[in-house]
A protein has these predicted regions:
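Amphipathic, charge-rich alpha-helical segments that serve as recognition/docking helices
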Residues: 44-46, 52-53, 88-177, 194, ...
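Short, charged/polar connector segments at secondary-structure boundaries
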Residues: 2-103, 115
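Amphipathic alpha-helical oligomerization/scaffolding segments
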Residues: 11-24, 147, 151-162, 174, ...
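Alpha-helix C-terminal capping/helix-coil junction sites
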Residues: 59-60, 142, 186
Length: 237
């Protein structure tokens, strides 16, 4: 059963920001890019898309308008909390050091909430980004003994942690039911998200193979999402 309710990622982020100076004696320091490690709990996309290219141009032209947030990760190494894509841009631009604020977290769940809150506030996130990150939240809650047994109760707890509704959490997590092929279609825009959500519903998971077979044997005529939609209608008929 779940223990005492933890604060949401957003309230945690706000409190961390407001109290950082008092709690951590926080100040900005230049840390070597080579000493910064990507956070293994970060499941948000690191694709070199238009948003990333814009970030890289900004870093190249104006430097870092906002400090990277890191936490200690061994001797002279630091795990990124906020700023994965900015650090990635710095690496590509050949920068040797970046401005960082060091923060410490009492446990893994607090660190994850800070990571999620920072990204949700600063980035345009896809439904699949949210699905994968919620999956990580579920795993960490389970590891800490805070995840209840019931699916509904799990979704309610995760909703409270992420400031989302329970229905939204369930909808995102359903996307994890899609197989690799359909996930690829949806992420590349070759399948509408409406169809993706429909095929991700538990009652429709068994239809995925039939839909993919239909698509493989029929001509898209320049409209692949339309073909997928027709395949779904055929499989459900």
């Amino acid at each position: 059963m779940a223990g005492k309710k933890s604060p949401s990622i957003f309230s945690t982020l706000q409190k961390t920001t407001e109290n950082a100076s008092a709690v951590n004696g926080e100040f900005v320091r230049q840390l070597r890019v080579s000493d910064l490690e990507d956070n293994p709990m970060n499941r948000f996309s690191m694709a070199e898309d238009d948003e990333f290219l814009s970030t890289m141009r900004s870093v190249e032209q104006d430097g870092f308008l906002e400090d990277i947030v890191v936490t200690p990760d061994g001797e002279n190494t630091w795990r990124i909390i906020s700023g994965h894509r900015r650090v990635m841009a710095a690496r590509k631009l050949g920068k040797t050091a970046v401005p960082c604020k060091v923060r410490r977290y009492p446990d893994k769940l607090s660190e994850l909430r800070a990571l999620m809150g920072a990204n949700v506030h600063r980035r345009s996130l896809s439904p699949f980004d949210m699905a994968r990150q919620l999956e990580t939240l579920r795993e960490v809650l389970s590891e800490s003994g805070q995840l209840p047994d019931g699916t509904k109760e799990q979704a309610e707890l995760m909703a409270a942690q992420s400031d989302l509704s329970r229905a939204t959490v369930e909808r995102y997590l359903d996307l994890l039911n899609l197989d690799e092929t359909m996930t690829g279609w949806a992420e590349r825009g070759e399948m509408t998200m409406t169809d993706a959500y429909e095929m991700a519903r538990r009652k429709n998971v068994h239809l995925q193979a039939a839909v993919e077979e239909y698509v493989a044997h029929n001509n898209a005529n320049g409209d692949f999402p339309g073909l997928v939609h027709r395949a779904i209608a055929w499989a459900k008929a």
